[in-house]
């Protein structure tokens, strides 16, 4: 369940109702939207009401239903379209773009951009069908997500039937998802099959951690292959068999090689202190409606990867790791 944390600054001089404070901040929402969207509200780790009083130093956590709002405004935001037909749009999402509107990000999301794009291409083919009627039949069917700072492939459905068809493939784990990443540190082996439980970190609820000695949390499996190394850095390909929140980031930390630029799970690197998250969804293999065979989509590797690799090649000799038999 998505959540957002708000720490009340020391500059707040008086106590105020929780809902009034949330409405006053830039990423906030009014009481009616908060009441209809929020699934749970925590104040300093304990359940709270909208009428609860808050003061400086308090920490509010709002957990909301993972549903896409219906009142989304189309926005003219450039998109990198990989593939499109009457049922789907496949996009190479940019790093820094949120997938869909939610608390803290009501605009400039992928869904806002898609609605504008679909509006442009919704040209009536029949005289008795209006553009608005075409748009009403199209809804932002988000069947999987990428973290805000993760770039790469996202497939979206244009109608309910396609959304259900694609969602069932993700649910049954029939979709192949492959990522490319640059890490600080080397994996313990040239390849491996990581199987753990992923649980929320009790000390920092924004984070998750991987555990093997518990049945709590959710099972997660990631298959990795180290492509090459440059000194203490490594280029890794990961195929995930499950789709847990922060899964690759958590599993890489578990292996002792945090993803470069991951501000949540690692400290800034001395050689790359300001680099963005070096995690990219490279490949997606899935069946499309009406097609018998699986379709393989690939997203171009972004320039930030080549910039980092260029610096690494100047400083360290390249070590190519041995090829291994693919783990199923």
PLM regions and their residue ranges:
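Long C-terminal interaction/binding lobes of large macromolecular proteins
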Residues: 224
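Short, surface-exposed secondary-structure edge patches
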Residues: 49-53, 237, 276
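Short, conserved beta-turn/loop elements at beta-strand boundaries and strand-helix junctions
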Residues: 119, 188-189, 203, 228-233, ...
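RNA pseudouridine synthases
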Residues: 1-193, 197-199, 298-307, 311-312, ...
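Pseudouridine synthases involved in rRNA/tRNA modification
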Residues: 1-36, 214-221, 231, 241, ...
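Short aromatic-glycine motifs in intrinsically disordered, low-complexity regions
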Residues: 205-215
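Short alpha-helix capping/helix-loop boundary micro-motifs
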Residues: 44-49, 232-235, 270
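Short beta-strand micro-motifs in enzyme catalytic cores
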Residues: 89, 179, 234-236, 282
């Amino acid at each position: 369940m998505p959540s957002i944390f708000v720490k009340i600054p020391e500059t707040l001089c008086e106590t105020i109702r929780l809902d009034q404070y949330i409405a006053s901040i830039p990423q906030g929402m009014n009481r009616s939207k908060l009441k209809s969207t929020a699934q749970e509200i925590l104040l300093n780790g304990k359940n709270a009401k909208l009428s609860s009083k808050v003061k400086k130093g308090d920490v509010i956590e709002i957990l909301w239903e993972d549903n896409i709002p219906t009142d989304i405004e189309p926005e003219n935001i450039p998109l990198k379209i990989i593939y499109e037909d009457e049922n789907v749009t496949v996009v190479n999402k940019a790093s820094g773009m949120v997938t869909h509107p939610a608390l803290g990000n009501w605009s400039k999301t992928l869904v806002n951009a898609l609605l504008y794009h679909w509006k442009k291409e919704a040209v009536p083919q029949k005289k008795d069908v209006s553009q608005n009627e075409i748009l009403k039949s199209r809804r932002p069917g988000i069947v999987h997500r990428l973290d805000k700072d993760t770039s790469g492939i996202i497939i979206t459905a244009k109608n309910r039937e396609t959304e259900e068809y694609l969602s069932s493939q993700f649910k049954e784990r029939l979709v192949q998802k492959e990522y490319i990443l640059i890490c600080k540190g080397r994996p313990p082996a040239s390849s491996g099959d990581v199987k753990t439980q992923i649980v929320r970190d009790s000390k920092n609820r924004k984070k998750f951690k991987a555990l093997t000695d518990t049945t709590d949390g959710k099972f997660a499996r990631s298959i990795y292959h180290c492509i090459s190394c440059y000194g203490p850095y490594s280029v890794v390909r990961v195929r995930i068999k499950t789709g847990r929140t922060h899964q690759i980031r958590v599993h890489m930390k578990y292996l002792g090689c945090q993803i470069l630029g991951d501000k949540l799970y690692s400290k800034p690197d001395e050689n790359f202190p300001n680099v963005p998250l070096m995690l990219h969804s490279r490949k997606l293999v899935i069946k499309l409606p009406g097609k018998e065979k699986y379709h393989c989509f690939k997203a171009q590797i972004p320039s930030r990867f080549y910039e980092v690799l260029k610096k690494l090649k100047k400083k360290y000799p390249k070590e190519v790791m041995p090829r291994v038999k693919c783990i199923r």
